[in-house]
Amino acid sequence: MSSLRLEENRKLATAAAVCPLSNCQFSGVVISAIADEQKLEFANKYRGSCTLLCSYDSQGVVLRIVADDDRSHVLKEYMISADTDAAQMGRRSYAVSLESDNLVLRFASEQDQQLFRKVVENVKHLRPKSVFSQRTEESSASQYFQFYGYLSQQQNMMQDYVRTSTYQRAILGNSIDFQDKIVLDVGAGSGILSFFAVQAGAAKVYAIEASNMAQYAQQLVESNNVQHKISVIPGKIEEIELPEKVDVIISEPMGYMLYNERMLETYLHARKWLKPQGKMFPTHGDLHIAPFSDESLYSEQYNKANFWYQSAFHGVDLTTLHKEGMKEYFRQPIVDTFDIRICMAKSVRHVCDFLNDKEDDLHVIDIPLEFHILQTGICHGLAFWFDVEFSGTTQNVWLSTSPTAPLTHWYQVRCLLPMPIFIKQGQTLTGRVLLEANRRQSYDVTIDLHIEGTLISSSNTLDLKNPYFRYTGAPVQAPPGTSTQSPSEQYWTQVDSQGSRNSSSMLNGTISVNGMGDGSMDITHGLMHPH
């Protein structure tokens, strides 16, 4: 039942968008095959006339041939795609090359032949590539949707307590925005946000999901008995049609550094289905950027690259690759977390307005920088994190990936400079970050920094598609040099204080036992009695 319902939803949503003439049939068609190409001789391929059944498919139009007098059995099935060769022959005939068969279709009327020709032309010439296909390499899209089609990956996101709970709180805390409303869930995945919308009272939710996860979302919808509320539609929002406009759009489109994966463009594209004054959850995103100092991280990457500086590795001189190795390591953004005290200045904030910004605005993002340095030290690069706000009628809710907030599966991102720069407190660091979108669903990130009033500058270009996942789960360590008192004396003072409390308790005849509270001890018999 799940797969049948999904297929029905997919066809309804995509047929009108891609090929409005693709769901039709033609009766009384005589089908001939070319028997001799040199003599151009034809022979009837089927006994009697046939009916052609056309239906939309993601690859084009499926052409099914059945006999006029027995439509219960499909004689042959073909796919009409953009690569199909076809040509008109006279007023009622049409030649078409399908797979290994070269066929001539003689229709019952000129009108039927013209309509069938339009079906083929719609697939071959009149179907433009979707916005998504134009901006995305096929191999990248395939890997992307395969990745998000795994239950384990959905689980990883769903188990991000901060992420999932914040979304639920934002939606349920603004139930007035969802009560009896039509909702669109873009990139629905497992459908968890759609379920939250239903919990908030939504009348109808269209859950759009392009990966194979759509089938699992449909199973969850049916097993939770909300199929009358949630309609799962397999496909891309750029390639489907909805039966109506929506009041609210919900999505989780953020990637590393907010913009990675270019899902935000899809989120903005979905606004074509939003009613005037409609809501978007989230409503806007803030990308924060700050200069940082971390000698340990810089040395770690530098020493990795120095592997290629060996002149006698098993008798082989590797040094010719040292420069390229260094370039490769420093082109990788670092995904991990850190103590915010490594930041040398207040972060610069760049805002993306999901309600008003255009898709084109995200193709090239040029962010001017000006930092007033708060501490003297070596600047090793720029740190990035983001916050998003859900602006509801009842309340505003923030989801933060700041190093001061609880950790999420987005972590934070740092981009290193191959040539760090020494800067003093009170100086001004200026420059820019340039994010240029690429067809691999990511960005090339160029950093240019300059110390105002000097000739000192540094730059780097990084590949956001290829980050280094450095997070180990270990507690974040405070930056070196941040202790203002002796850590040793602080520790022993704490121990002495604890010892004094225990001694006092013993004198009073009570001690704390394994955190279970006070107990009294009979010293004579060595017995303990709980109070």
Swiss-Prot record:
Its EC number is 2.1.1.319. The keyword Transferase applies. SUPFAM superfamilies: S-adenosyl-L-methionine-dependent methyltransferases. Pfam families: PrmA (PF06325), PRMT_C (PF22528). Its main location: cytoplasm. Keywords: Chromatin regulator, Cytoplasm, Methylation, Methyltransferase, Nucleus, S-adenosyl-L-methionine, Transcription, Transcription regulation, Transferase. It is an enzyme of class 2 (transferase). S-adenosyl-L-methionine binds at residues 154, 163, 187, 209, 238, 266. GO terms for molecular function: histone H3R17 methyltransferase activity; histone H3R2 methyltransferase activity; histone H3R26 methyltransferase activity; protein-arginine omega-N asymmetric methyltransferase activity; protein-arginine omega-N monomethyltransferase activity. Homodimer. Methylates (mono- and asymmetric dimethylation) the guanidino nitrogens of arginyl residues in proteins. May methylate histone H3 at 'Arg-17' and activate transcription via chromatin remodeling. This is Histone-arginine methyltransferase CARMER. It comes from Drosophila ananassae. The gene is Art4.
